[in-house]
């Protein structure tokens, strides 16, 4: 329950929702929810300073029950998330796997209907630029994650994901894919290490034509992945031969 003074500061909408994420038994009184809804409908939430929005929402996403916060904000009309049961299951899994705040949020936006909706969701909650980039990158990589079954396709994934310059972010996205797909990703994590471990300088020195260096370095990285995927490729070929 709250007093009439509650409506004087719209950040309290977010704070109440955050409490529901932090405290499992926290319940929002119907009168309070009605007041929160009225404040959103009257446009009072539009005046919130961006930093204050994310300060509250981020703490809720990092809590043990972020879905409770999402539900509370959705009930009062504050634009938050795609209404998707699969998203709820994945976000719960991300919490149980103790994935970080950024991973949880990016996984939620992966269920938006399109890139524009995902961008709007991030904008509504005033997310930092780095997190918006993570959301966009992960969404773009989803088809490549699904196709990464051999050295060539895994290499394409790591290349597009900028594993060389952003190895920590790549590892995080691989873990996010594990939660989303429920597949074992240890091979992809190892592939990322091998990809980044190639001595590009040594490969470049061995080339007499400078224009061939980029292709040679990429080929060396693909070659480094071959042994990792060789066993599964061989098993797949045997299965194909036996079906003829």
Q: What do these predicted ranges mean?
A:
Residues 1-123:
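Glycine- and charge-enriched loop/helix tracts that form the active or gating conduit
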Residues 13, 29-33, 50-54, 66-67, ...:
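Alpha-helix initiation and N-capping motif
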Residues 18-24, 164-244:
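Charged substrate- and nucleic-acid-binding regions of tRNA-handling and nucleotidyl-transfer enzymes
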Residues 26, 66-67, 78-82, 148, ...:
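Intrinsically disordered or highly flexible coil/loop and linker segments, enriched in small
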Residues 36-50, 95-97, 122-135, 141-144, ...:
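Short, mixed-charge aromatic SLiMs
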Residues 40, 61, 158-161, 207:
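Hydrophobic residues in alpha-helical segments
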Residues 50-51, 150-154, 225, 233-236:
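Short, structured secondary-structure boundary patches
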Residues 84-183:
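Divalent metal-dependent catalytic cores for phosphoryl transfer on phosphate-bearing substrates
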